[in-house]
UniProtKB/Swiss-Prot annotation:
It comes from Clostridium perfringens (strain 13 / Type A). CDD domains: RNAP_beta'_C, RNAP_beta'_N. The keyword Nucleotide-binding does not apply. The RNAP catalytic core consists of 2 alpha, 1 beta, 1 beta' and 1 omega subunit. When a sigma factor is associated with the core the holoenzyme is formed, which can initiate transcription. This is DNA-directed RNA polymerase subunit beta'. PANTHER family: DNA-DIRECTED RNA POLYMERASE, DNA-DIRECTED RNA POLYMERASE SUBUNIT BETA.
Length: 1178
């Protein structure tokens, strides 16, 4: 058996009959499975021991040879080889068919490969294969045509007319096999190429398709006649097991039934042929054999599926591979693993950031082998057996050993659904009593976990390498930033925020206000002795050593600020230490909210790195919890004070609405206008009530504190608690014009409550539906971008893209500095006024340089981008730039494709889950959200299409009674006219200038139109900005580079239009880099280059168009992908992640890259080795 790690590629092809016989250990001749009395396999049956190997280890069928000492002997009585029973998982057999049978994949697939190569329609082919028509194989001298179909009557007439010997006709797979074997591929290909030059239209398309199939057979070495099978392989018996249930009945795999039908019909056909039965009977039997083989290979593809008991269709070989429950997705891409456990999680506020609490009994079971080894090493137990007994009986010595074993062995915690890479993190386990896993409160955001009964799984990394990776790459304390946008993900929440907020408030007239203190320690002492209130404004003398001399100053602060600042490094840059007036100030002297905590973490991470940040976070956590307990901020009904002004506002609104109604009744305004105005008035009133409420709340009001600090709740929720609920939407999404006047504090009446239920129910239904949609979107994104890995330092491209700040209307939504941070320049950047060089080409822009460039007022900058990267596989570090999760330059081996897919998919689920939080208050629901993102990534024609101008020019609008027409006049005077359909709103005005690709009417643009007008760059830019718009509306930040990775994968294929002297066929889609390489090859000997256009593929299509057939087959349309790959004899280069997971190799990313794996440390010639290592680290 070959080693699983030493091959570089995998090829798939058609199996010839010889090859199938070569795999086989014998022929299955009988349909019997096992003997019902002895329960032993029948000889020559589907489970025969002589063919497949013994059922029990080292024991033959008849029992003459038992025990391992007879290893390898073939029993002379029963013919069974004495060996391990595991061989029954790998030994195959075969069935010799009495008549050839066509393989349904090649006959029935779309397009029918058999039909193409024979130039017959699938319907004609079906008639021949299923014995409804004869086909002329050799017309000889007669006037019949080759491949002409004859029905029964015509065949008889021809026989009478010409005599039976004067021509050859046949039916069934035999005839087709003869025709296939007669095909001369070289000649057919040459003829088709000639025809191609003359033909056009539909005929040309058909010829190209045929040529493709012929060329595939030519290049792959497959023979066309192998699409018809003479001999059928039988898969090993342990892969289609038969097991005895309680009560003596048997459960068996469906495949056994399907094989039995094939064998029965085959044996019957053999008998009929030996007897010389009449033609019509033999023909019927052959047809039945063909159908049985079809059902075995792909049940239900043609006609009605074969059903088992209870009318359930049987699972055929194809079904074993397909879908979520098939071999690919169920067993190859997702396996269950040993050394794992799961339990409910509870909060562990006393833990450090890198720790998790592991229940004692679970830890003992997970680390059992380690504990046993240690027990023997320490001499507590004499051998492994007694050690095992000690562990199983849980003797007291075991616990001490467990403590030692666990000491520096990280474990992985995972919470389903794992939407992004932060859904699995490593922790240092701490043994805890009880049966629940303890989780650090700060990592809950990353896991999206709460403690209402969530469960989590624990996994133990076994090997030293796995432990090292867990400790250095996956430890929770190191994963503070979100890979999607580089913002901190461990921002303290809820109580921690509330405690910090409470601590940093100040109060006029508090006890001890205005006192002077000599030092911070004195303040703390006074606070502990209750001499001074935590919110009192006091003065403190601060002494510091500056440039070797002691200086002191007096600052105004509160005890709370002093306590809070003990957690925070005092050099984060919030205070300008150069300025003598600010020199002694505390680093944090502003009110702490969730937002400002995020900023503090950001600055600390950039300045001090992850370790110090995690220590700071733990300090903030402890302080926050402590002071939110001391502050005892809680909610009572008396805290919701309904402002008296509310009733005046309502009265005023009622009067206005009455006026609007009167105007409507007098016919001064239309129904629509009345509705609009009423809605507008009530919205305005609700807002006014909310504002009045917020202004009337005391700053120490607990509800206000919770919302203002960002701990929990929002203005909208406070408005509903103590203001008024306002307008609601009906199930259709239309706003009901009667508002809910009451707040929850006052209580809703029956009608108001009923109206409220619409939104709540809609929210729940939406959530359930959209979660599935979002998960599927993520899966497609992962599949399309999974092979994008950083593979090299610099691809050497000269290209880039221009970026500028993004505006929506007059408001800047993303500044230039944000877009430049962490990217490389693609050309020299000069100051727009002075002309000085700000950054040379290929300079990395950190936040400081990016700020500096943006501040000069420069409009746009050309940067290196994933779009223009020239790496054939993956991307290079310079085109990618900064790793968002670490804020450092990206490393070679980083799986940026998967990270991109997760970054786009993960908020998708959240967008969809966020609809129900407002309880159905009328607002912008994200209907245009998820479906819009999907529509863009699938490059579909959008709903509500806008009309786009194909050229740049000046607009002229003409309106007649019947229609409106927009004319665009170019500079050269050409006119292009566009008819505007009724009800469309124009985006352009008469006489203005517009560019090519600009919208004339409102609506979404078809990305394919942009592609044809503005080219590939325009289309990429459009997709990027449109997807960003949707996410931004939801307040989700995703870095551009993630979208760039996916969009690049959508625009990688070229459709060949002109062949030139290349080997590329027109109409074929090919990877951009292969296209370039082929053109360069032709150019080298002066030939004519091929022409082609870049095509925009949706993510599903792009994922199926990948070079790897394993990856595509495990994604969707498994049978179609495999059929195609087998005919072409495709070679899978195993460059992506999925392919390698499927065949069980290490993935070629991270430490699994060949570059890192081939490192060896040689002590003899160490200087050479160190050179290679240095080169890798740079």
């Amino acid at each position: 058996m070959f080693e699983l790690n030493n091959f570089d590629a995998l090829q798939i092809g058609l199996a010839s009959p010889e090859q199938i016989r070569e795999w086989s250990r014998g022929e299955v001749k009988k349909p019997e499975t096992i003997n019902y009395r002895t329960l032993k396999p029948e000889r020559d049956g589907l489970f025969c021991e002589r063919i497949f190997g013994p059922i029990k280890d080292w024991e033959c069928h008849c029992g003459k040879y038992k025990r391992v000492r007879y290893k390898g002997i073939v029993c002379d009585r029963c013919g069974v080889e004495v060996t391990k029973s595991k061989v029954r998982r790998e030994r195959m057999a075969h069935i010799e068919l009495a008549a050839p049978v066509s393989h349904i994949w090649y006959f029935k697939g779309i397009p029918s490969r058999m039909g193409l190569i024979l130039d017959m329609s699938p319907r004609a082919l079906e008639k021949v294969l299923y014995f409804a028509s004869y086909i002329v194989i050799d017309p000889k001298e007669t006037s019949l045509l080759k491949k002409q179909l004859l029905n029964e009557k015509e065949y008889r007439e021809a026989c009478d007319k010409y005599g039976e010997e004067s021509f050859v006709a046949g039916m069934g797979a035999e005839a087709i096999k003869t025709l296939l074997s007669e095909i001369d591929l070289e000649r057919t290909a040459a003829e088709l190429k000639e025809e191609l030059k003359q033909s056009t239209g539909q005929k040309k398309v058909r010829i190209i398709r045929r040529l493709e199939v012929v060329e595939s057979f030519k290049s792959s070495g497959n023979k066309p006649e192998w699409m018809v099978v003479d001999v059928i392989p039988v898969i090993p018996p342990d892969l289609r097991p038969m097991v005895q249930l309680d009560g003596g009945r048997f459960a068996t795999s469906d495949l056994n039934d399907l094989y039995r039908r094939v064998i029965n019909r085959n044996n019957r056909l053999k008998k009929l042929l030996d007897l010389g039965a009449p033609d019509i009977i033999v023909r019927n039997e052959k047809r039945m054999l063909q159908e049985a083989v079809d059902a075995l290979i792909d049940n239900g593809r043609r006609g009605r599926p074969v059903t088992g008991p209870g009318n359930r269709p049987l699972k055929s070989l194809s079904d074993m591979l397909k879908g979520k429950q098939g071999r690919f997705r169920q067993n190859l891409l997702g396996k269950r693993v040993d050394y794992s456990g799961r339990s409910v999680i509870v909060v562990g506020p006393e833990l450090k950031m890198y720790q998790c609490g592991l229940p004692k009994e679970m830890a003992l079971e997970l680390f059992k082998p380690f504990v046993m080894k240690k027990l023997v090493e320490d001499g507590v137990a004499h051998n492994i057996k007694s050690a095992k007994r000690m562990v199983e009986r849980v003797m007291p010595q075991v616990w001490d050993v467990l403590e030692e074993v666990i000491a520096d062995h990280p474990v992985l915690l995972n919470r389903a659904p794992t939407l992004h890479r932060l859904g699995i993190q490593a922790f240092q386990p701490v043994l805890v009593e009880g049966r629940a896993i303890k989780l650090h409160p700060l990592v809950c955001t990353a896991y999206n976990a709460d403690f209402d009964g969530d469960q989590m799984a624990v996994h133990v990394p076994l090997s030293v390498e796995a432990q090292a990776e867990a400790r250095f790459l996956m430890l929770a304390a190191g994963n503070i930033m979100k890979p999607s946008d580089g913002r901190p993900v461990c921002v303290p929440t809820q109580d921690m925020v509330l405690g910090s907020y409470y601590l940093t408030m100040d109060k006029d007239g508090a006890k001890g206000e205005g006192k002077y203190f000599a030092s911070f320690d004195e303040v703390i002492m006074a606070y502990q002795l209750k001499e001074v209130d935590i919110h009192a404004k006091i003065n403190v003398k601060v002494t510091k050593e500056i440039d070797g001399e002691l200086k002191s100053g007096i600052i105004k602060t509160t005890p709370g600020f002093i306590i809070f600042n003990e957690c925070i490094p005092q050099d984060l840059g919030f205070v300008n230490r150069e300025n003598p007036e600010e020199m002694f100030n505390l680093e944090i002297d502003f009110l702490i909210t969730k937002k400002s905590l995020g900023k503090i973490i950001d600055k600390c991470y950039l300045k001090h790195g992850p370790t110090k940040t995690s220590i700071m976070l733990d300090n903030i956590k402890a302080t926050g919890y402590h002071y939110s307990s001391i502050g005892a901020v809680t909610v009572a009904a008396s805290d919701m004070i309904v402002p008296q002004k509310k009733y005046e506002l309502l009265k005023e609104a009622d009067e206005t609405v009455d006026k609007i109604e009167k105007m409507y009744r007098r016919g001064l305004i239309s129904e629509d206008e009345r509705y609009e105005r009423v809605i507008e008035k009530w919205t305005e009133t609700t807002e006014e009530v909310a504002d009045t409420l917020m202004n009337s709340l005391d700053k120490f009001n607990p509800i206000f504190m919770m919302a203002d600090s960002g701990a929990r709740g929002s203005k909208s929720q406070i408005k509903q608690l103590a203001g008024m609920r306002g307008l609601m939407a009906s199930p259709s999404g239309k706003i009901i014009e009667l508002p809910i006047r009451a707040s929850f504090r006052e209580g809703l009446d029956v009608l108001e409550y009923f109206i409220s239920t619409h939104g709540a129910r809609k929210g729940n239904a939406d959530t359930a539906l959209k979660t599935a949609d979002s998960g599927y979107l993520t899966r497609r994104l992962v599949d399309v971008s999974q092979d994008v890995i950083v593979r090299e330092h610099d691809c050497g491209t000269q290209n880039g893209i221009y970026v500028e700040e993004i505006k929506e209307g007059s408001e800047v939504v993303e500044q230039l500095a944000e877009r430049l941070t962490g990217r490389y320049t693609a050309e020299d950047v000069f100051h727009p006024e002075t002309g000085e060089l700000l950054a040379a080409k290929d300079t990395y822009m950190d936040p400081i340089l990016a700020e500096k460039i943006a501040d000069t007022g420069i409009q746009k900058v050309k940067i290196r981008s994933v779009f223009t990267c020239d790496s054939k596989v993956g991307v290079c570090t310079k085109c990618y730039g900064m790793n968002m999760a670490t804020s450092y330059k990206i490393n070679i081996g980083e799986a940026v494709g998967i990270v991109a897919a997760q970054s786009i998919g993960e908020p998708g689920t959240q967008l969809t889950m966020r609809t129900f939080h407002t309880g159905g208050v009328a607002g912008a629901d994200i209907t245009q959200g998820l479906p819009r993102v999907e529509e863009l990534f699938e490059a579909r024609k959008p709903k509500g299409l806008a009309i786009v101008s194909e050229v740049a020019g000046t607009v002229r609008i003409e309106e007649t009674k019947k229609k409106r027409t927009v004319y665009v006049v170019t500079d050269s005077g050409e006119e292009y006219s566009y008819d505007i359909p009724f009800g469309s709103r124009l985006k352009v005005k008469d006489g203005i200038a517009i560019g090519a690709g600009d919208e004339i009417t409102e609506g979404s643009v078809n990305p394919h139109d942009i592609m044809s007008i503005k080219g590939v760059d325009g289309a990429r830019e459009y997709l990027l900005s449109e997807v960003q718009k949707v996410y931004r509306l939801q307040g989700v930040d995703i870095n551009d580079k993630h979208l760039e990775v996916v969009v690049r994968q959508m625009t990688r294929k070229i459709k060949v239009t002109e062949q030139g002297d290349t080997n590329l066929l027109p109409g074929v889609m090919i990877d951009m880099f292969d296209f370039r390489a082929e053109n360069e090859r032709v150019e080298s000997f002066g030939g004519e280059k091929a022409q082609g256009d870049i095509v925009l593929l949706g993510i599903t299509k792009a994922a199926l168009a990948t070079d790897s057939f394993l990856s595509a087959a495990s994604f969707q349309e498994t049978t179609r992908v495999l059929t195609d790959a087998a005919i072409k004899g495709k070679i899978d280069p195993l460059v992506g992640l999925k392919e390698n997971v499927i065949i069980g190799k290490l993935i070629p990313a991270g430490t699994g890259m060949m570059k890192y794996r081939s490192l060896k440390l040689n002590t003899e010639n160490s200087n050479q080795e160190t050179e290679t290592i240095i080169e890798i680290e740079e």
